Regions:
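Conserved catalytic core of the tyrosine transesterase superfamily
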Residues: 1-295
């Protein structure tokens, strides 16, 4: 397999992303988007005109791209033209599409339990990894990048190093989860990475963890259309249903904006069920009125 040639322009884009502390996943997404634009143009992307951008956006729309994918590419091109090319004015010719607001899928507590118990073996590796995803609300990449030293059993905390947005944070470590992690450590004696891959100098990959989740979900007989990230959604929703302050959940999830966390208020069905409708107060007044009329 021949290595892909890195042009001076691509190298500059990569350097600009590194300077701004962009994560590896975001870097790859930006490069893919810029490559797609270059393929559409048939020439170097830095030579594009406003008309080229208009034609590309029409092409993406006609190709049936989802608003989410469309916007991901626009974000990448805005970065490319403003930061790498120094052509800030080009941002005026790129429009975001409105994304339909979909409520996240959420598991019941029983479904989470069934999935974790069905995690593939041998051993406790994937059960422990998936349990952290739910028990601490971590993203797949955050679970994979955990080190043994990130588990603080004295203060019952997990240190999440450079999560999304390149920010560190602390999350809770429950006694039950600590017990499972200790059982995993006694079984495998991992060094360095909490969940080593092959070779052991590398951690397991998000793709491996996602495959383990899919297998566990299938074995547990859970039919909901869900991904590994659904465990994180469920963590947040179950906390909210237990009356945890939404601002605390925001910190635990590592959300920069409270509005991002607030969407879980729309799926906290237990909270909805337990909330008394003002109609109940009206009904009581009506009952009292009826009783007085009968006296």
């Amino acid at each position: 397999m021949t290595e892909e040639i890195v042009t001076p322009l691509r190298q500059r884009v990569i350097e600009d992303m590194r300077i701004r502390g962009m994560g590896e996943k975001a870097q790859k997404s930006h490069i893919r988007a810029i490559k797609d634009f270059a393929a559409f143009l048939g020439r170097p992307p830095d030579t594009a005109t406003p008309e080229d951008l208009r034609a590309y956006q029409l092409h993406m729309t006609d190709s049936g791209l989802t608003p989410s994918t469309f916007n991901v590419r626009i974000v990448a091109l805005r970065f490319f033209f403003s930061m790498t090319c120094g052509r800030e004015e080009m941002k005026r010719y790129m429009q975001f599409r409105t994304e339909p607001r979909k409520l996240p899928v959420v598991f019941s507590v029983e479904e989470v339990s069934d999935i974790l118990m069905a995690a593939p073996g041998p051993g406790l590796k994937y059960r422990a990894a998936l349990s952290i995803s739910y028990g601490a609300g971590l993203r797949a990449s955050e679970v994979c990048n955990l080190k043994i030293s990130d588990i603080d059993s004295d203060r019952m905390l997990i240190h999440v190093e450079l999560g999304k947005g390149q920010k560190d944070r602390k999350v809770m470590l429950s006694p039950g989860l600590l017990e499972l992690l200790r059982a995993w450590w006694r079984e495998a004696r991992p060094e360095g990475w909490l969940f080593p891959g092959k070779p052991k100098i590398n951690p397991i990959s998000p793709r491996q963890l996602s495959r383990a989740f899919t297998s566990a979900k299938h074995m547990a007989g859970v039919k909901k259309p869900a991904t590994l990230h659904t465990l994180r959604h469920s963590f947040a929703t179950h906390l909210l249903e237990a009356n945890t302050d939404v601002r605390v959940i925001q910190v635990l999830l590592g959300h920069a904006k409270l509005t991002t966390t607030a969407r879980y208020t729309h799926v906290a069905t237990k909270t909805i069920r337990d909330t008394v409708s003002p109609y109940e107060m009206l009904a009581k007044l009506q009952d009292q009125t009826v009783k007085r009329s009968l006296e």
